[in-house]
Amino acid sequence: FPTTVNPLIQNGFEPVFVDVTLPDLNLDLDQVEAALKKDPSIRGIVFAHVLGNPPDMDRVMQIVKDHDLIFIEDTCDGLGSEYDGKPLGSFGHISTCSLMKSASTSSP
């Protein structure tokens, strides 16, 4: 989603992209850990909960803790969804809801 990553670029950050797993389209947490090992200067994780289907949030939060990362979750595609009874958007240090035509929420 460009509306998830463009604000980072516009504010001088350099994103490091990782792939998703199939068929669930979740963030590939093995690739996240590999990227963190390859580049320890990475300071945060930002991703959107695709189709309201979150990755293993327990593992995400452990990665965040282990690497002292900032975690920003974009709930543009996950409004109303939960992980283990906890609403998406309540895990990260910051929660956003980006708007674009292909997301569940949009603006004119």
Describe the predicted segments one by one.
Residues 1-16, 20-29:
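Substrate-binding/gating loop at the entrance of the active-site cleft, primarily
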Residues 25-107:
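Active-site phosphate-binding strand-loop segment of PLP-dependent enzymes
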